[in-house]
């Protein structure tokens, strides 16, 4: 563990903290702490505990694990780059903070056990079974009001029918509340009326305008501390409120309505729980709240309710997940900045079981741009390869994968190797008969690396027809390669002048050849 709070105080003025490893984890050296402009001390680099890493899909391959366990000095994953999103304790404030960590150890001691814990955690996420929530709404039906009961509500109906705006809302709330009290006072000895049944009836039949719905939400909040004394009752009322919100308004919702509903939720928490009420809400109501918060752009609450559904073993609807991902992209403006990617990982950390077992094409497309290392990309591609809709998913995402491969490094030989790895992963999905449209994209990507050997190999193996238009695309790619890699790998096998000459003479027409002549 890290040093005690007393020791931290002792050494803070000297601007460093002596970090000690957990149990068997590799010992870490003294690391200087640098204060930024906001006087927040930068956390010392250290390997986080596997449970602190929130990456939802990275899984080191057997080769990565073997390499890490066989490297005596500074073994690492993800090349030791600071790209593993983690929730760790700040060494001074002890608050949980979101950081990008390095998976780089000082030496080989404890690496194997660390990997075992990390892989076991990923396996646990993989084994989580989620099922869609039951769509039965029978428990939310208002069944308890007879025609005689409804006749007793005439005074409430009259008050609601007179509401046209929110200017006198508070006085109307008091009027409704007083009338409710009168109803219960008149029938105190023989009534079978319950407050939740009355409110649910009124919301269902009179909550067709924003003003009336806000009034009924405020009345519900007032009744929380008198007649609404069970969460079962609140489930019924919340269900009907959220149905009306969905039916009445398109986002953006009225700020007054948003405030009223969120005040009601806060009051429910205060009334029944010291913290949050999710554990006692019906899954359908949780899905409704999740959908509502996504539409209002409240990502923090959306994440809370989404995570709660998953922890309860419930698979949210694909449309809700897609809207959640869209809301994240809107919030971060599809940014690929380091800080924004790290924050995005925090919002999708709970999706690990869904990514592993229930991933959709839209979800995979969202995740590809978030990869900052080729090994992450391979982990995601392997998940897709094992999914039930592997072929359809690869058909839709392979061009994005190919493009993404070339963003991790400018080294043409590494890029060529990575392209070959991706090709070898997806080939079995097509029974080795990869569609020519994808093979052509690989060829153009190899052309951008100046790899004449792989271009020739793929053209021959898959019998690609080189139309005039396609030859021009190859030539443009090769010219870009010569500009970008003019001083690199010119003598390497597959990249040198002899291979270039061979490729030009065998695969390009006479008119196209001249464009590549020195």
Curated annotation (Swiss-Prot):
Compartments, as annotated in UniProt: Mitochondrion
Primary localization: mitochondrion
A Pfam family this chain is assigned to: AEP1
Annotated GO CC locations: mitochondrion
UniProt keyword Cell inner membrane present: no
Keywords: Mitochondrion, Transit peptide, Translation regulation
InterPro entries: Aep1 (IPR031467)
First and last residues of the transit peptide: 1-19
Family of this protein: Belongs to the AEP1 family.
Task of the protein: Required for translation of the mitochondrial OLI1 transcript encoding subunit 9 of mitochondrial ATP synthase.
Protein name: ATPase expression protein 1, mitochondrial
Organism this protein belongs to: Saccharomyces cerevisiae (strain JAY291) (Baker's yeast)
């Amino acid at each position: 563990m890290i040093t005690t709070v007393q020791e931290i105080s002792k050494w803070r003025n000297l601007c460093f903290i002596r970090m000690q490893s957990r149990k068997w984890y590799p010992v870490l050296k003294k690391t200087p702490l640098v204060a930024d402009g906001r006087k927040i001390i930068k956390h010392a680099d250290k390997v986080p505990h596997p449970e602190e890493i929130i990456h939802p899909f990275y899984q080191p391959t057997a080769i990565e694990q073997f390499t890490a366990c066989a490297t005596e000095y500074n073994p690492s994953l993800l090349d030791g780059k600071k790209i593993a999103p983690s929730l760790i304790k700040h060494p001074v404030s002890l608050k949980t903070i979101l950081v990008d960590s390095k998976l780089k150890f000082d030496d080989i001691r404890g690496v194997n056990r660390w990997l075992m814990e990390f892989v076991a955690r990923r396996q646990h996420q993989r084994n989580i079974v989620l099922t869609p929530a039951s769509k039965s709404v029978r428990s939310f039906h208002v069944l308890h009001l007879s025609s005689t009961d409804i006749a007793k509500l005439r005074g409430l109906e009259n008050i609601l029918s007179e509401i046209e705006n929110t200017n006198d809302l508070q006085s109307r709330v008091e009027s409704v509340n007083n009338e409710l009290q009168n109803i219960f006072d008149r029938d105190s000895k023989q009534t079978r009326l319950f407050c939740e049944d009355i409110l649910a009836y009124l919301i269902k039949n009179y909550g067709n305008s924003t003003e009336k719905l806000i009034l009924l939400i405020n009345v519900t909040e007032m009744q929380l501390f008198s007649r609404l004394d069970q969460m079962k009752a609140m489930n019924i009322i919340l269900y009907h409120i959220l149905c009306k919100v969905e039916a009445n308004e398109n986002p953006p919702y009225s700020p007054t309505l948003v405030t009223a509903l969120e005040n009601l939720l806060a009051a429910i928490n205060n009334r029944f729980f010291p913290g949050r009420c999710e554990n006692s809400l019906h899954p359908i109501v949780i899905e409704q709240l999740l959908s509502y918060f996504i539409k209002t752009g409240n990502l923090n609450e959306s994440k809370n309710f989404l995570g709660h559904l998953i922890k309860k073993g419930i698979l949210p609807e694909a449309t809700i997940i897609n809207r959640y991902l869209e809301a994240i992209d809107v919030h971060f403006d599809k940014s690929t900045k380091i800080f924004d990617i790290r924050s995005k990982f925090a919002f999708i950390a709970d999706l690990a079981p869904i990514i592993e077992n229930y991933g959709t094409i839209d979800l995979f497309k969202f995740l590809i741009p978030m990869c900052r290392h080729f090994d992450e990309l391979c982990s995601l591609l392997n998940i897709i390869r094992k999914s039930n809709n592997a072929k359809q998913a690869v058909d839709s995402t392979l061009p994005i994968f190919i493009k993404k491969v070339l963003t991790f490094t400018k080294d043409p030989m590494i890029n060529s190797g990575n392209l070959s790895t991706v090709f070898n992963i997806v080939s079995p999905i097509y029974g080795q008969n990869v569609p020519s449209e994808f093979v052509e994209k690989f060829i153009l990507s190899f052309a951008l690396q100046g790899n004449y050997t792989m271009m020739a190999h793929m053209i021959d193996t898959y019998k690609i027809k080189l139309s005039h238009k396609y030859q021009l695309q190859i030539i443009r790619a090769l010219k870009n390669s010569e500009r970008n890699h003019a001083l690199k790998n010119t003598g390497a096998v597959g990249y040198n002048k002899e291979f270039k000459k061979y490729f030009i003479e065998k695969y390009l027409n006479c008119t196209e050849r001249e464009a590549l002549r020195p």
